[in-house]
Amino acid sequence: MKKLVIRLCFFIIPVMIYAGACVFVDAYNVFHVDNVRLTDITPNQNFIKTKYLLQNKGKFNALLLGSSRVANLPKEGLPEKTDDGRELNWYNMTYAMGSASENYDTVKTLIDGGVKLDELIILIDDVSMWKGVTKGLDNPIFTTYQTYEESPIRFYYSYLKLKPVWRIVPQIFFEYRLGENNEGKKLFYSYGVDVNNTNMEIGSAGDMPEPENSLEYDGGSGAVGAIKDLSELCKEQNIRLIVVTSPILESTYEMAISNGYLDFLYDAAQVTDYYLFSGINTYTVGPEYYFDASHFRPVVGLEMEKVMFGDEDVRNMAVEKAKNDMSLVEFGHLVTKENSVDVIENLEQEINELNRK
């Protein structure tokens, strides 16, 4: 018996040490929802942010939803109050490759969990048109909160099985040393974005980057259905929903169109109105307004907010500022079911004129 106990100790102790190391290193931060460590590995923000809001139900009543691009809508340009005078506290639920279908699931989970929401902004783009819900436990960055709900034990075990990323340990200790002076962590918990997403500078002009790849739009992602479901849910819950499209850099925009992006925009207009910032304008033809081939800079996001939330003079100035000699659809034009055919035809004409130059 004594030998058996000794053997078990030799087995159990190393396993416990290894499990403890996995929990400590925790590259994707699923064990550190209340104390994220901002390393060079992308955390599982879908899970972290959803759990954070459920643990702090009264802290935020207004959310931004979408892919990583929506991180570049600055907090200072958002409405401070509802139409009837209630204060709005905004949190950005942005995460890499966030899809409309996942966003709907997130909102439903939050409402069911007792989070009171008054306003939502959802940004749709060329990722939305093909990206559906991430299923299963195979991708630690993208595993959803809903997968966790199905089986918390399986969820956490899937992360314990991952080999610890030892190279980030110095970064973790650096984070701990910052303590209360960690501005990145404060920003994450107050608005859900990275420090880079507050940089209001315009970049350097240069050559047009190679396009960001997109996949073909065939309706399989369920994006349009999810947008419709979200719209109906918001009506039921008396939540103001604002749908907005991303301004997409010219090279990436052309590839998106070749994969059916304009069809997606038309289909989306059949289920909800939205502000259109995709198209040819001052920003989408200027690489200096983008961090890369995918992400517009916050300075563009602020102009978008002026169009959506500014008074008439501010809005008109922002629209005029974005206009160039190829623009046929104004920056932030409100697309509806009734005008969608004309808008899509103008977008097609824009891109055809651009290609002839």
Regions found by a protein language model. Name each.
Residues E201-G286:
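Flexible, glycine-rich surface segments
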Residues L123-I124, V133-Q237, K321-K357:
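Secreted/periplasmic serine-hydrolase-like ester/acetyl group-modifying domain
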Residues V25-I48:
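Alpha-helical transmembrane signal-anchor/signal-peptide segments
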Residues R69-F155:
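Membrane-embedded segments
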Residues I6-D26:
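Hydrophobic membrane-insertion alpha-helices, especially the h-region
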Residues P43-T50, A100-K108, G225:
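N-terminal post-signal-peptidase region of extra-cytosolic proteins
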Residues I257-K357:
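C-terminal regions of proteins
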Residues I41-G66:
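Short extracytoplasmic
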